């Protein structure tokens, strides 16, 4: 079992946030260029803890947000949602009590319908409600590791279809993005994926985009996905 508790960091402070995942990072200002040494430790903390929280930051300008994101790799642009003017990599979310929809109402892995899904997502919060509106996270390493060895072996040989048309069609019409302007990608991914850097295995299915396990009948697929 992977245990990140003994990791030592020299340029940042890392405080474990919860037993199963997440850590709070202090000692770094994301509104400025992050040093190579600090970034290396942030990347290591990301691999160790999966979700990182940077509290009480100065506002991060869009260009700095994009610059920091590019340190992790090529940035993804959302195939359907309207993006920030001048920054196609940034997807702005506005929701109030009167909004017809709120992004991410159900458990999902962001844009898993893409052929090459994003490594992760960077959120910068500007206006928060006094209560509610929580963003929740789940550790899919632990989800896999909690399964019996027989079920792990069974799932390891399967693939799943991830689709987006049922999610994206009509979703952004009230924000000036017509269906004719969007892409609705579809992809097939292994049900169990191995992280290329940590070597850990994780479940890679979700309620929002995963529509079928391909090697099973429709009824068998439904039963497994609803477990």
Feature locations, PLM:
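Non-heme Fe(II) oxygenase catalytic core, chiefly the N-lobe of the double-stranded beta-helix
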Residues: 1-227
